[in-house]
Amino acid sequence: MANINLKEITLIVGVVTACYWNSLFCGFVFDDVSAILDNKDLHPSTPLKTLFQNDFWGTPMSEERSHKSYRPLTVLTFRLNYLLSELKPMSYHLLNMIFHAVVSVIFLKVCKLFLDNKSSVIASLLFAVHPIHTEAVTGVVGRAELLSSIFFLAAFLSYTRSKGPDNSIIWTPIALTVFLVAVATLCKEQGITVVGICCVYEVFIAQGYTLPLLCTTAGQFLRGKGSIPFSMLQTLVKLIVLMFSTLLLVVIRVQVIQSQLPVFTRFDNPAAVSPTPTRQLTFNYLLPVNAWLLLNPSELCCDWTMGTIPLIESLLDIRNLATFTFFCFLGMLGVFSIRYSGDSSKTVLMALCLMALPFIPASNLFFPVGFVVAERVLYVPSMGFCILVAHGWQKISTKSVFKKLSWICLSMVILTHSLKTFHRNWDWESEYTLFMSALKVNKNNAKLWNNVGHALENEKNFERALKYFLQATHVQPDDIGAHMNVGRTYKNLNRTKEAEESYMMAKSLMPQIIPGKKYAARIAPNHLNVYINLANLIRANESRLEEADQLYRQAISMRPDFKQAYISRGELLLKMNKPLKAKEAYLKALELDRNNADLWYNLAIVHIELKEPNEALKKNFNRALELNPKHKLALFNSAIVMQESGEVKLRPEARKRLLSYINEEPLDANGYFNLGMLAMDDKKDNEAEIWMKKAIKLQADFRSALFNLALLYSQTAKELKALPILEELLRYYPDHIKGLILKGDILMNQKKDILGAKKCFERILEMDPSNVQGKHNLCVVYFEEKDLLKAERCLLETLALAPHEEYIQRHLNIVRDKISSSSFIEPIFPTSKISSVEGKKIPTESVKEIRGESRQTQIVKTSDNKSQSKSNKQLGKNGDEETPHKTTKDIKEIEKKRVAALKRLEEIERILNGE
C-alpha cells in the first residue's frame, strides 16, 4: 500500500481551501435552520443522553413526526460548535471545510490501493473540487455526509489490513472495522454500506476471485466433485463476521426507530405513491439523472422534490431511453469488472461498488425516501465516479496521440469544476439567494416558490412573499402547505377574510374523515397545522371561540399525540375563562413532551389564573428554568410572582432572576423597572433610583417607572426632584390621577403654589367627579383660600360621596364652627399639614405601582409551516393598581403611618379650635 506524502496532502488541502474559503461567509440556510437554529440538542442545558434519544433535527425518535434520521455523533459536533461560538455560522462552515479536506486526503490513500500515484492524486483532486459537493460542504447539515465518509473510508482501510501472510486472518483490523462501521452509521445511515464494499474487496480483490471461478468452484462442490479451498473458507468466515455485524447494526437501528418509517407526503417523493409502472419507470430514471449530475454538474438545485422531475407514466416516454442507456453502460462495466482478473477490472469493480452500494439507501429500492434527488447523498458515490474518471484518463494518457489532449482536458475539467464550486458557494450565502438560484434551474417545484416566500417573510417583506406563495399555489394547486402560507401572509397583512379563505382551501384539501381510519399513517404532521392556524385566526373574534375550539378538537381526534393542538387549545381555554380545562390540555401535552420548558411555563400561567401562585412557582416556573435556565418569560414572571408574594426571603432569588432576564433582554425596560421595585421594597432608595432611571432611558414614556420614581423622590424628601418627573409623566398621560394628586401635594406643601395645586385637584374631578381624595384635597385648597362657605359646600359634597368617613364630618364641623364664630383671620390649615389629613392625602402605601407593561405567555407553535401566531396572557396587574399582597411588616408600617396621620389630624383640629 503506497503512502501519501506531505506534498500531496498540501496540494489537496490547498485546493479545498481555495474552492471553499468563501463558504465561511455563508449563513444557516434551508435544513440548517431546523438542524442548528431550532435544535435544542445543541444547547448545553440539554442532557447529553438526549442526543441519543432524538433524531437529527432534535425530535424524539418515538414521535411519529420524527424524520427517523439517527445521527447523534453528527449532532455532537454541532454541540461542540455551539459550545465554542454558539450560533455564529463561520465556525460551523470552517469545520465542514476541514472535514472535507480530511475526506479528500483519506480518499487519496484509498485511491492508491487501485491506481498509480498520479491517477490517485487526480482522482482526489476531482473529488475535492466537484461542484456536486457544495451542498454537503457549504450546507452545514452536510456534515453528516462528511463525518460518515471519514469513518467509512477508515473502516475500509482498516479492513484491507485484515489479510495476513499465507492468507491468514488478522482479527484486530476486522474488529476495528466493525467499530468504525458503527461510528460511521451513527454519523449517517449510509455508513453501514461500507460492509458491502469490504465484502466485494475481500472476494474479488484480496482473494482475486472472478465470477467464472466462483461459479466453477460452486458447481463442483454441489456436484460432489471437489471441496471448498481453505482460503475460500477463510474468506467465508470473514464475510460471515461482517454480515453478522451488519445484521446486528441493522437490528439496533430498527429498534431505535421503533420499527416505524418516517411519514412523507406525496409532494416529497411523488413517484413513491404512484401506481405501477409509473413508480418503477420513474425510480429507474432517477439513476441516470443522478449519474448526469456527476458527469455534468452545471445546473444544481437545492431541492428536487414535487414537480421538479415529471413522472414517467408511459413506456413510450423518451426519457426511458436514458434509463436504457444507463443500464447498458453499467452492465458492460459490471461484466468487465467481475469476469476478468486484471488490475483494470479490479479498479472498475471498486469504482462501481463505491458508486452503487452507498447510494442504495437513497435509491427507493427497499423503502421510499423523502426526496426525489438529493445532491448531498452523492458525496460518497462520487468517489467511485472520480476513480472511474481517473482510471479512464490513465488509459487514454498512456497513448502518445492523446497524452497532451488528455492533460488539457483534465486541466479544464479541474479548473471549471473549481470555479463552479466557488461560485456555487455564494448561492448558499442566504436562503433568498439559495432558493432564487434554484428557481433559475427549475420553476415547476412549488416548494422552491414557497421557500423564497419564507425568506422574504423572514425579512418582513410580506407583500413580495405573498406573490411567491400565490405562485406556488398555481404551480401545485393541491399543495396544502402553499395555501397555508398564503393564509398566514394574508393574516400578517391584516387581511383576515382572505386569510380565512386560504386556510379553508387548505383544509378542504385534507383527506376526508373515514371512520376507523388511522390518520397518522396518511397525513403529514405539518399539514395538520391548518386546523391550528385557522383556529388561531378565528378566535380573535370573541363570538367564534367555540368554533375555534372545535377545530382544535378535530385536530386532536385525527392525531391524539398532536402536542401543538393541546397547547393551542389550552391557550384558548384560558381565554374562555376555563382554567381547569386549560390545565387538563397542558397536562396532556406534558405527557407527550415532559422536557418542554414552554409547556411548564404555560402551566404556571394556568396556576396563576387559578390563584395558586405557590404551585406556579415551585412546580412549574422552576421546572421550566431547570429545562431552560435562559427561558426569558419564566425568569421574568417567576420573579414577579416572588415579588408579589411579599415574602422577604424570596427577594434575593427574584433579584437574581431579574438580573438574568436583563442579561438576556437588555433592551426591555420592564426588567429594570421591576428591579427598581424590588429595591424600593428593600428600602434601597439609591439603587431603586438607578434602576428606574435605566427603565425610563429605555422607554421614555414608561408610565409606572415615571410615577414610582417621582414617588420615590417624594418619600425620600426630594420632592422638588419629583416635580419634573411628574411633569414628564403628565405630558404623556395627562389623565394620570395619582400623578396629579402627588403633584398637587408637592405644589401645596413644597412650592406653596395653591393655584397650581387647585388646578391639579380640579383636573382630577373633571375626570372622576366621585374621587374622594381629590375632592377632599380641593376642599382644603378652598380653606387655604379663606373661602369658608365654598369649603363647607365642598365638604358636604365629599361627605355625600363617603358618608362613613369620620374625618370628613369632623372637618365639616370645624369649618361650620369657624363660620359661626366669624373669627376667621388667618389660614386655619397650615399648608405643611395638609397632605396628612386622616392619611387620605397621597398615602404612599396605596399608590406604589407594581407593573409597567403586560407580559406575554409564550405558546409553542409548530414551525413546520412557519406559523408565528402567539397569544397574550397578562401576568400580574397593571401599573396603577395597588400591591395585591402585603407582608406583616408592611401592614405594621401602614398602621404606623395611619396613627401618625391621626396625630397630625389632632394637631390640625387644635389649630382650627384656636388652641
Curated annotation (Swiss-Prot):
* Compositionally biased tracts (Low complexity): 865-874
Cytoplasmic topology: which positions?
Answer: 1-8, 115-120, 159-166, 215-231, 339-353, 398-404
UniProt catalytic activity: a di-trans,poly-cis-dolichyl beta-D-mannosyl phosphate + L-seryl-[protein] = 3-O-(alpha-D-mannosyl)-L-seryl-[protein] + a di-trans,poly-cis-dolichyl phosphate + H(+); a di-trans,poly-cis-dolichyl beta-D-mannosyl phosphate + L-threonyl-[protein] = 3-O-(alpha-D-mannosyl)-L-threonyl-[protein] + a di-trans,poly-cis-dolichyl phosphate + H(+)
Molecular-function GO terms, alphabetical: dolichyl-phosphate-mannose-protein mannosyltransferase activity; mannosyltransferase activity
Name the PANTHER family for this protein: PROTEIN O-MANNOSYL-TRANSFERASE TMTC3, PTHR44395
Q: Give the family per the record.
A: Belongs to the TMTC family.
Give a short account of what the protein does.
Transfers mannosyl residues to the hydroxyl group of serine or threonine residues. The 4 members of the TMTC family are O-mannosyl-transferases dedicated primarily to the cadherin superfamily, each member seems to have a distinct role in decorating the cadherin domains with O-linked mannose glycans at specific regions. Also acts as O-mannosyl-transferase on other proteins such as PDIA3. Involved in the positive regulation of proteasomal protein degradation in the endoplasmic reticulum (ER), and the control of ER stress response.
The name this protein goes by in its record: Protein O-mannosyl-transferase TMTC3
- Species source reads Homo sapiens (Human)
